């Protein structure tokens, strides 16, 4: 266990870790409340997908700008300002919920603003970790622990949201998120940066694109995350449908379903944090693609809550095993002067593909009148891609090992 949390020995990363963990719990509380309200207000799977699309599409459009800003300016200042914006949105949503004046357009607008802020924040946050981890050998562990905070919040946040929605009310969910940002902002202000806050490079996104295009391991890592995000999109978008229409539950059951997925993700992040080397990481990516795909197909045909929970656990664990492993490899390989922009491409493939999946799957579910085919399609894609990776991964692993030896 000591080996799992070894990066927390450093003061700066320890402060960042705990402040971010508190803030992310609030973020997940708000996310669950938004999805629940969207389905309650509209009663439409298509509108549920559209609200998700409006929050995720900025990741596809604006993330390159976030990556360029991260390479040119103080990463800490970018994070602070984006969190101030997100706190303001959470406060506004709490007031709107208290007045009971939600409409589809308010939900879409709020999601879009949060999406733009996230597009600035996420690549910056990925690159910021290298500034507060001063021993490069600890970088894989720090990245895994960063994923751990996200997934611990993903486990706790929906449970808190379900309890808050059932016992208190919707405004309380947004108020919890607004207050949670205080922890993140405070801890980031107390971090002592030992090197310049920004790389101040004037390079363009084209330089990062050229690096990814020419270097096969980086190209495949970005592609793997993109395909995985498309495959996991139904689990992100349609859980309110399953909670209400399939399992005849309410917001508390939605929290349980999302918590099961978060539990699997948390277990995967803990496993990766306990690894002392990158050995076997390629095989773990392949296995997660195959297992996650099977879980998606099985979930589509399942109508038993007792079976749905372990399937969601497996799906969540597979997803995080893939994207966090790819993150660790990419951050280990990428040159420092390209880090912000390359991680912007990673974020585009990670988060930016979700809106396409949400919109396409939402339209498909609306036309068919069922969400079952959506999960089947996603599962088949994941299994097929896992088979492709079985063919190409050995060569990619050799190229990555050579690059790491010469870094």
Segments predicted by a language model, with ranges:
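Juxtamembrane intracellular "pre-TM" segments in multi-pass secondary transporters
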Residues: 1-13, 193-223
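Primarily residues marking transmembrane-helix entry/exit sites
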Residues: 9-17, 45, 104, 108, ...
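Substrate-agnostic recognition of the 12-TM MFS/MFS-like secondary transporter fold
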Residues: 14-31, 55-70, 74-89, 106-165, ...
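Short amphipathic helix-loop junctions that connect adjacent transmembrane helices
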Residues: 32-45, 238-252
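Transmembrane alpha-helix termini and helix-breaking/packing motifs in multi-pass membrane transporters
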Residues: 35-41, 93-99, 156-176, 245-246, ...
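Juxtamembrane helix-start elements in MFS-like secondary transporters
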Residues: 44-52, 139, 250-254, 258
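C-terminal transmembrane bundle of multi-pass solute transporters/carriers
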Residues: 61-64, 72, 78, 92, ...
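Helix-loop junctions on the cytosolic side of multi-pass membrane transporters
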Residues: 127, 131, 170, 174-201, ...
């Amino acid at each position: 266990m000591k080996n799992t949390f070894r990066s927390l020995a450093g003061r700066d990363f320890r402060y960042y870790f705990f402040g971010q963990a508190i803030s992310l719990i609030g973020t997940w509380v708000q996310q669950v409340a938004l999805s629940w309200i969207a389905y309650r207000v509209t009663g439409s799977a298509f509108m549920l997908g559209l609200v998700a699309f409006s929050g995720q599409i900025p990741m596809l459009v604006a993330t390159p700008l976030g990556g360029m800003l991260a390479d040119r300016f103080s990463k800490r200042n970018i994070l602070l300002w984006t969190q101030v914006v997100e706190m303001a949105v959470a406060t506004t949503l709490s007031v709107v919920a208290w007045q009971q004046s939600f409409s589809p357009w308010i939900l879409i607008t709020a999601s879009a603003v949060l999406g733009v802020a996230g597009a600035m924040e996420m690549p910056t946050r990925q690159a910021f970790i290298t500034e507060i981890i001063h021993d490069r050998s600890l970088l894989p562990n720090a990245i895994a622990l960063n994923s751990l905070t996200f997934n611990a919040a993903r486990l706790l946040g929906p449970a808190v949201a379900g309890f808050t929605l059932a016992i208190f009310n919707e405004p309380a969910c947004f108020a919890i998120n607004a207050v949670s940002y205080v922890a993140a902002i405070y801890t980031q202000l107390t971090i002592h940066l030992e090197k310049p806050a920004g790389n101040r490079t004037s390079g363009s996104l084209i330089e990062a694109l050229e690096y990814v295009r020419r270097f096969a391991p980086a190209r495949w890592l970005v592609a793997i995350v993109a395909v995985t995000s498309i495959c996991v999109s139904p689990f992100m978008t349609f859980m309110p449908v399953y909670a209400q229409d399939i399992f005849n539950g309410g917001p508390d059951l939605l929290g349980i379903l999302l918590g099961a997925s978060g539990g699997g993700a948390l277990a995967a992040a803990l496993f990766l944090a306990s690894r002392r080397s990158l050995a076997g990481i390629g095989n773990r990516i392949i296995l997660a693609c195959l297992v996650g795909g099977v879980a998606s197909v099985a979930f589509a045909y399942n109508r038993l809550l007792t079976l749905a929970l372990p399937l969601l656990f497996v799906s969540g664990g597979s997803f995080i095993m893939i994207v966090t492993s790819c993150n660790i490899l990419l951050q280990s390989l990428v040159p420092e002067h390209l880090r912000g922009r390359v991680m912007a491409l990673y974020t585009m493939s990670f988060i930016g593909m979700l809106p396409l999946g949400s919109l396409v799957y939402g339209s498909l579910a609306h036309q068919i009148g069922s969400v079952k085919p959506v999960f089947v399609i996603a599962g088949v894609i994941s299994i097929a891609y896992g088979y492709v990776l079985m063919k190409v991964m050995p060569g990619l692993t050799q190229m990555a090992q050579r690059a790491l030896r010469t870094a």
